[in-house]
């Protein structure tokens, strides 16, 4: 199957600033946190859990619940959070007639995004070179792949970019095949004379003579 690049329509307002900060509290996509706590009051518990990527064992003089543990873990947590957010936060929705993926890509300009389909998979790629922000210099790059539902025509996949920096990729689902109504075929009966045809009738008459 050939690769197809999906063009996306720009829905951004003229005042859009591609390098604006990202505010998790204003995005409903942040509810799918990929392991990142949604609410600030959960962070202190998350810091003390050895399973999270930025866990650092506290010093002997500080307890796990003390402020020293949070202070010690904060830099590592910030790095882990940045890794999570730089790859984008996405959600998948499927209704009876449509499949849709929404991905937060507000860190990227439209020309830095690529959407394409190949062998039943949608691939979204974003990349920007190193540039300066309020914290220093940063470069970002991500690739996300989503498997299309069975039967979806890849040529019907479309995408759009909202003013809030949300990339939406969607495709119509194939309609279910409806079974035809049941039809009863009547059986017709033929007489013996009709089965043999006219010649059979003549032979029977000559035999009687």
Curated annotation (Swiss-Prot):
Post-translational modification: Phosphorylated upon exposure to protein kinase C activators and heat shock. Phosphorylation by MAPKAPK2 and MAPKAPK3 in response to stress dissociates HSPB1 from large small heat-shock protein (sHsps) oligomers and impairs its chaperone activity and ability to protect against oxidative stress effectively. Phosphorylation by MAPKAPK5 in response to PKA stimulation induces F-actin rearrangement.
Record-level GO cellular component terms: axon cytoplasm; contractile muscle fiber; cornified envelope; cytoplasm; nucleus; plasma membrane; proteasome complex; spindle
Annotated ranges, domain sHSP: 80-188
Subcellular location: Cytoplasm; Nucleus; Cytoplasm, Cytoskeleton, Spindle
Keywords linked to the UniProt accession: Acetylation, Chaperone, Cytoplasm, Cytoskeleton, Methylation, Nucleus, Phosphoprotein, Stress response
Highest rank taxon of the organism: Eukaryota
Spans annotated as Interaction with TGFB1I1: 74-209
Modified residues annotated as N6-acetyllysine in this record: 127
Disruption phenotype: Mice are viable and fertile with no apparent morphological abnormalities in tissues under physiological conditions.
Biological role: Small heat shock protein which functions as a molecular chaperone probably maintaining denatured proteins in a folding-competent state. Plays a role in stress resistance and actin organization. Through its molecular chaperone activity may regulate numerous biological processes including the phosphorylation and the axonal transport of neurofilament proteins.
Family: Belongs to the small heat shock protein (HSP20) family.
Full protein name: Heat shock protein beta-1
Gene: Hspb1
């Amino acid at each position: 199957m050939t690769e197809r690049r999906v063009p996306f329509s720009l829905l951004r307002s003229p005042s859009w600033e591609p390098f604006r900060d990202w505010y998790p509290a204003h995005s409903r996509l942040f509810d799918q946190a990929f392991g990142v706590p949604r609410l600030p009051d959960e962070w202190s518990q998350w810091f003390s859990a050895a399973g999270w990527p930025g866990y650092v064992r506290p010093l002997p003089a500080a307890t796990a619940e003390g402020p020293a543990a949070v202070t010690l873990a904060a830099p590592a947590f910030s790095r882990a959070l940045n890794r999570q957010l730089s790859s984008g936060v996405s959600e998948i929705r499927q209704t009876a007639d449509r499949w849709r993926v929404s991905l937060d890509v507000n860190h990227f300009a439209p020309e830095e995004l690529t959407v394409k389909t190949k062998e039943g998979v949608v691939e979204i790629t974003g990349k920007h070179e190193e540039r300066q922000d309020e914290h220093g210099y940063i470069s970002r790059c991500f690739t996300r792949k989503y498997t299309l539902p069975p039967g979806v025509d890849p040529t019907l996949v479309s995408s759009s970019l909202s003013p809030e920096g949300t990339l939406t990729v969607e495709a119509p689902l194939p309609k279910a095949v409806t079974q035809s109504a049941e039809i009863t075929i009547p059986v017709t009966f033929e007489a013996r004379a009709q089965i043999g045809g006219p010649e059979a009738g003549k032979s029977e008459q000559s035999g009687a003579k």
